[in-house]
Amino acid sequence: MAITAQMVKELREKTGAGMMDCKKALTETNGDMEKAIDWLREKGIAKAAKKADRIAAEGMAYIAVEGNTAVILEVNSETDFVAKNEAFQTLVKELAAHLLKQKPASLDEALGQTMDNGSTVQDYINEAIAKIGEKITLRRFAVVNKADGETFGAYLHMGGRIGVLTLLAGNASEDVAKDVAMHIAALHPKYVSRDDVPQEEIAHEREVLKQQALNEGKPEKIVEKMVEGRLNKFYEDVCLLEQAFVKNPDVTVRQYVESNGATVKQFIRYEVGEGLEKRQDNFAEEVMSQVRKQ
């Protein structure tokens, strides 16, 4: 297939590799983005894919907690102007209150539910769109329940650019649970522990690391040992409990949590716009579009 400049740009953003290397990788893999990432890694050109695709959409993540129930949600807007608008932020908080109270099981169920004001959730969002003049969407949410004795940790970074909700069992204080949430916001782990990593992901990583070592010219008899060592580094990248604790790098998150008599049961991390693309307006046009609405 034809390799476009946009494909090369996307691969560069995902791997940090040079333009010509990205073009060659895409050519060698017939334009398959994931295989091109693996090709670059196997050649030692890229260490790993960046942890998130380009983040471009605007909006806000928010967390609400009441008793033994918590909700984390993401609401998207088209521009940062609207995301910082008081009316938009009020909408997000009212949606959070509804989700916390009604505990819908899916997005479709949530949008069809009736709010305390008599409107359905979807109609309420549509009314906000009409007033604000910009597309607004409830993108995702999760309702989490805890048992007595368990602890929620909630952390919002940069006014809701990133939201993290943690659930700890044991004797953890809210401060400990929040510290873990702050760590997750900064380090972006995918899983709690090694046990949570899917076997197919481990097998894929093992094969990439093996090819990487062979391409470095290492003797085959020591390749397996190298792979196991590098696999440990992979676990440190993706598993929360394996990571050096951001507030005290001398201990792992596991050691920090256990020293406080707790264990991590679950976490949810929302970063606004993950995987979404924003309209290609430039900043001047964005300003003008808002001025015209005044």
From Swiss-Prot:
Spell out the coiled coil positions from the record: none
Where in or outside the cell it occurs: the entry states: Cytoplasm
Q: Which InterPro entries match?
A: EF-Ts_dimer_sf, Transl_elong_EFTs/EF1B, Transl_elong_EFTs/EF1B_dimer, Transl_elong_Ts_CS, UBA-like_sf
Q: Where is this region: Involved in Mg(2+) ion dislocation from EF-Tu?
A: 79-82
Tell me which UniProt keywords the record has, alphabetically.
Cytoplasm, Elongation factor, Protein biosynthesis
Which GO molecular function annotations are given, in alphabetical order?
Answer: translation elongation factor activity
Query: Which Pfam families does this chain map to?
Result: EF-Ts_N, EF_TS
Keyword Protein biosynthesis in record: yes
How is this protein annotated for GO cellular component? cytoplasm
Read off the PROSITE patterns from this record.
EF_TS_1, EF_TS_2
Which HAMAP family does the record cross-reference, listed alphabetically?
EF_Ts
| Biological function | Associates with the EF-Tu.GDP complex and induces the exchange of GDP to GTP. It remains bound to the aminoacyl-tRNA.EF-Tu.GTP complex up to the GTP hydrolysis stage on the ribosome.
Q: Which family does it belong to?
A: Belongs to the EF-Ts family.
Official protein name in the record: Elongation factor Ts
Originating organism: Geobacillus kaustophilus (strain HTA426)
